[in-house]
């Protein structure tokens, strides 16, 4: 009886998986996606060389595309502020374990109010333990976070990252802050829906269509920000295993934003569509951005508020300011980027 029941369950699971796979391509068409761009692992490896910024800013460079945020670029971005209205693009700390958050932020109270005296001076305190890389917490990836064939951006060896942290391409290089123009490419609103379904790929044609509709061009030194509506979907349907399915950029978009000379890539997911569609390479957009181009990444932004505010104003460009933790040797940092209109 148990054996038959197990076989029946297995057959039902297979049938469900086949149905889901069969539905995937029509779903992409319904959401307005472009025709699939087939990319092999060999194509990806060629892109690592074709899109490389190694030595562009010198053999000792560790800033990568952030070099494109010049003093003139900062002044241009500051001039975008007309109202002084500012909005966070960070997800509030996720403290509860979930299928999309296996490493929640742990808060330990070291001093609580009830222990303080009733008169005179008192105080409270806490400690946070944060494993910020992954699919839940808003953070910035430094240029040492990903490697290919034992190398990170600008040819630095994997041996530069030890138990003592990263000696090259660490997050400390960005301690003076990010001040530049941000462009929100709201792909869900562009398609007239609340959110893109998991596994929906965004193609270069989609980026072109968004620019035409929004009448805004992504420029050199910008933070390019992609909203898929990932958190809106979570609010509507609950958490899901995002490593198995997440809307995002197809690897073919890498040429697009390399040509635009963006300084930083950001979005409400992992930037990559998951699955990536490139056999043997889980996150090709991450690899091309961090390793080849030296373009840091803002992962897991919460773009629901800024999406509504930008749509209300029909203004998709704004000042972006962000500051990392000044952590020597860090491979990244928690982050609270601010958009100001």
Explain the meaning of each model-derived region.
Residues 27-29:
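Sec/Tat signal peptide C-region and signal peptidase I cleavage site
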Residues 31-341:
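Active-/binding-site microenvironments in catalytic and ligand-binding cores
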Residues 3-4, 25, 223:
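General helical secondary-structure elements
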Residues 2-18:
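N-terminal secretory signal peptides and thylakoid transit peptides that target proteins
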Residues 19-24:
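Hydrophobic h-region of N-terminal signal peptides that target proteins for export
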């Amino acid at each position: 009886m148990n054996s038959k029941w197990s076989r029946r369950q297995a057959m039902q699971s297979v049938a469900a998986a086949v149905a889901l796979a069969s539905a995937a391509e029509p779903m992409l068409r319904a959401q307005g996606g472009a025709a699939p761009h087939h990319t092999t692992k060999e194509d990806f490896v060629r892109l690592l060389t074709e899109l490389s910024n190694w030595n562009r800013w010198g053999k000792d460079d560790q800033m990568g595309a952030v070099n494109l945020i010049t003093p003139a670029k900062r002044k241009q971005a500051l001039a975008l502020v007309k109202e002084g209205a500012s909005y966070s693009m960070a997800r509030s700390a996720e403290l509860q374990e979930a299928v999309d958050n296996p490493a929640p932020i742990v808060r330990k109270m070291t001093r609580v109010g009830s222990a303080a005296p009733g008169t005179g001076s008192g105080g409270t305190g806490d400690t946070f333990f944060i494993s910020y890389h992954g699919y839940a917490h808003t953070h910035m990836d430094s240029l040492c976070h990903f490697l290919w064939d034992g190398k990170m951006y600008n040819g630095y060896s994997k041996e530069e990252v030890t138990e003592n942290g990263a000696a090259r391409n660490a997050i400390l290089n960005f301690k003076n802050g990010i001040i530049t123009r941000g462009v929100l490419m709201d792909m869900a609103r562009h398609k007239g829906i609340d959110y893109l379904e998991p596994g929906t790929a965004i193609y270069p044609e989609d980026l072109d269509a968004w620019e035409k509709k929004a009448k805004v061009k992504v420029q050199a030194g910008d933070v390019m920000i992609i909203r898929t509506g990932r958190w809106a979907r979570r609010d509507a349907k609950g958490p899901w295993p995002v490593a198995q399915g997440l809307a995002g950029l197809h690897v073919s978009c890498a040429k697009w934003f390399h040509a635009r000379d963006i300084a930083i890539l950001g979005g409400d997911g992992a930037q990559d569509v998951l699955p990536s569609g490139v056999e043997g390479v889980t996150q090709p957009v991450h690899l091309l951005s961090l390793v080849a181009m030296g373009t840091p990444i803002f992962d897991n932004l919460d773009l629901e508020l800024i999406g509504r505010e930008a749509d209300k104003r029909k203004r998709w460009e704004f000042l972006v300011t962000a500051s990392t933790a000044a952590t020597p040797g860090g491979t990244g940092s928690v982050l609270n980027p601010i958009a100001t209109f």
